[in-house]
Amino acid sequence: KGEQTQKLTKPDEKYVNKALKKEDILIEKYGSMNNYYDKAHIDCKVLKDMNIYVSASGHLMPCCWVAGQLYKWWEKPGQNQIWRFIDNVGGLDELSVLKHGFKKVLEGDFFNNIKSSWKKSSCTGGDGKLKVCSVKCGTEFDPFGAQFEEVNT
């Protein structure tokens, strides 16, 4: 009793995700991370690799990051930005490969609308750039990709 058995500390510098070191630079350049996301050039990871995501319920999405926006525990379903894109194509059922088949869903407006949004100047508003795309596939800030870079030992 009374002895310290666990201590949570910062990791050694060599284990810190290198992309996180760019965050302060981006904030200085853009004023905030949200401003960066508004301006981010998107290089879609899954489009490059020709990947796609099918949910357990049979809904076709561009990637797991977009699919993960559907049901955030802190938001009521339908509040997240992705729902505007879904509602614009007639609802979630329009993305069901079980009802419509893979080809029809893939060639529908949902995927094209997301890709077209990347040219928008802001992530805000009903027809803004899909923010999750800026967060995960913005070219100046990629903590996901950086985690796979080799650590110098």
Residue ranges and their predicted role:
Residues 1-104, 113-115, 142-151:
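Radical SAM enzyme [4Fe-4S]-AdoMet core and its adjacent flexible, acidic
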Residues 119-153:
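Cysteine-cluster motifs in flexible loop/terminal segments that predominantly coordinate metals
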Residues 106-125:
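C-terminal structured domain segments
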